[in-house]
Amino acid sequence: MEIGTRYDPKNIEMKWYKHWLEKKYFTPRGAGPKYSIVIPPPNITGKIHMGHALNITIQDILSRYKRMKGFDVLWLPGEDHAGIATQTAVERYLSTQGKSRRDFSRDEFLNIVWNWANKYRQEIKNQIMSIGASVDWTRERFTLDEGLSKAVRKVFVDMYKKGLIYKGKYIVNWCHRCGTVLSDEEVDYHEEEGALYHIKYPIKGEDDYIIIATTRPETMLGDTAVAVHPSDERYRKYVGKIAILPLVGREIPVIADNYVDPSFGTGALKVTPAHDTNDYLIGQRHNLPFVDIFDENIVINENGGKFKGMTAEQARKAVVEELEAQGYLVKIEKMKHSVGRCYRCDTVVEPRLMDQWFVSMKPLAKRAIEAVENGEVTFIPDRWKKVYLNWMYEIRDWCISRQLWWGHRIPVWQCQDCGHYNVSENEPVKCEKCGSTNLKQDEDVLDTWFSSALWPFSTMGWPEKTPDLERYYPTDVLVTGFDIIFFWVARMIMMGYEFMDEKPFKEVYIHQLVRDKYGRKMSKSLGNGIDPLEVIDEYGADPMRFTLAILAAQGRDLKLDVRFFDTYKKFANKIWNATRFVLMNLEDFEKVDIKLSKLKLSDKWILSRLQKTIQKISEALDSYDFNIAANEIYNFFWDELCDWYIEAVKNRLKTEERKVVQNVLVYVLDMSLRLLHPFMPFLTEELWTKLPTSGESIVVAQWPEIEENFIDENSEKRFMQLMNIIRGIRNIRAEVNVPQSTKVKTFVKGTLTDEEQEYIKFLGNVESIEFVEKRPELSATAYISLENEVYVSLGTLIDVKSEVERLRKKVEKLKSDMEKFAKKLEDENFLKNAPEDIVEETKEKQRLFQEQIARIEQIISDLEAKA
């Protein structure tokens, strides 16, 4: 059966995906050993990015591999409602229409968001399909669907009853742009240019003052103390005295607290308990009053006196000017300091004292810590275990309420008569305490990550005891990025143990961060993002998948250059053309068992190499070394199958050995396409179904098993020697400018079988092979080993004198070019500071130069020798 002359992914990809869905290949059978994964649900805020593409590719490689290994695979898909991100996106859209959320009732606004959600859920689904994800769409879930909403309500109520959820007034992170509280993990901290302001605080009743230093002079309006370290001799005399707050006149105590760092600034700290987390803790320890100076828009409120109505930035400028005018400002120092910004909109986050709902995390963390410490849950690579544990040891309570409309509304109804909180899975009719029907539901919604934390079991039907939950929970692996270890991974582990009494997954594979070719993080501001959908459109899904897999080395960020996609599109073309060549030579094919007695050296070699490749790829996939697995099949298919075996047997296809060669080709190609399938599903399905030995679909074909009788170390060694001899002959041709079409004469000191000589003549374009006792004059060394020495005669092909002169100049040029790499490798700063892959790349370039120089110098030596 023939195929088209060129590989066109657009003609085959969606055709096969629709076929797979129709055949229900991605729906688990319910029999055999189980293997389950839940997809990290992408946000419904737009298009997927290259990080998603990598994540999906890795999960699909695992799913397809396990499916072919006979596992009952469930890869469960879904999407996340993404509270802040989605509401922000919708509000941004409304602003282009001249409207805001406040122009609508809550229900009207939620209708708009649901329409948005349904549209983008379908778009994201189509995008995931275009990558080739073998997820079971019949089990697709959404973090706001009714089943998950039921699970969320039950978890909230159960945790409240256990005392794990409580409401309290605490310092929280407030984003005034998003109009909501953020968890600690949703705040990104950056070093930014700022200033340290030194300000005099007069001591009451004395002609003295204490100088404090602060980066936020505007918050002094809410100061309720000055703190110093108890062992700081400079300030011991002030402890217990009263300071007068400049501009405000408030009397505030000078206190001693161990939190204060005597080496920072002046060693005296202004304490603003309502607007700083650490100050809040100091305030609690010393029973200080809490003065809140900001409203929800971070505008100064009535507690700010004459500065009321100013933004934080305006107030800072005005306060500093007033301090200077009244003689309180001592000096201003430039400095860098850490500034917290909203992870969604990059707005500066303001610590505020607010009533919020919290989860008590310490009780939940205990088992989740033990699970990772004892290996019940493992991280790959292992270094992420330490990152996880360090965070868990220091875990703080989680603020779960958000001042949004889009999300899971908190299932709490406060009685408007007695104030009691009625916490219920369903809307209560009356207050459980006083019987009043005057109830009002909490306006806030839950943090998006609250519902996401339940994802592994809520998606399988919990709290009902469903067959899916019984069979597929716990899942086998979670594939995710390091940036959500705290947001999501840790919380899933805690919730899994709390509500399922079982881990949610056995392994956590932390994949690479996708960066640009220079190692920079992809971002809109840099304009260096690569759109996976554009890549698929130009190169095809399979080349993109293979590129991501072959670059996915454990422990390293993935540096992506668009040229890589072209490289692996060429690989796809190579696979296509090799299959086409085989199919064109199968018109009289008859399947027979491959008998070792009828095989030639090249047959034995390729069959043995195939078994080694099967073993290495299987081991690599089992250990999540996707780059190693991809490299193995790439090298085997292109270098060994195409460049050597197919070239070696072309003549034999015209002889009585045709049937043997056909069967070896079909077997090796069949197994190779199966090995390639997890990486390049569309291409392999298109080609595999054309083979005379194919079955129903490569999706459900058996993963190749090692045929021990085909492993032949001796044949591998012998054929490797032939390859090195032929490479040596080709290298000499290249170095002395002898065209590949010109036949050369060779001399051999040693022994070669007739079969080996035929390979050398055919693949090396050799006219004759003469056996000699010593190296002839005017010949170049192609190969030397303990068994054989091979030389190429150059006497009639070149002018020796001019060739030696040319080669010497070439050596000088190569040495000059190599020098820049040598200098880099001698530079301690380069070796210490350059990324590891850049250092290795430099070493490799130097090695290649050294090899080429050594080859040419050997040819020069051979040409100059007289015997």
From Swiss-Prot:
Residues that hold ATP according to the record: K524
GO molecular function terms listed in the Swiss-Prot or TrEMBL record: aminoacyl-tRNA deacylase activity; ATP binding; valine-tRNA ligase activity
Cell compartments where the protein resides: Cytoplasm
Catalytic activity: tRNA(Val) + L-valine + ATP = L-valyl-tRNA(Val) + AMP + diphosphate
GO cellular component, one term: cytosol
Residue positions of motif 'HIGH' region: 42-52
NCBIfam families: PRK05729.1, valS
Subunit structure: Monomer.
Role of this protein: Catalyzes the attachment of valine to tRNA(Val). As ValRS can inadvertently accommodate and process structurally similar amino acids such as threonine, to avoid such errors, it has a 'posttransfer' editing activity that hydrolyzes mischarged Thr-tRNA(Val) in a tRNA-dependent manner.
Protein name: Valine--tRNA ligase
Originating species: Fervidobacterium nodosum (strain ATCC 35602 / DSM 5306 / Rt17-B1)
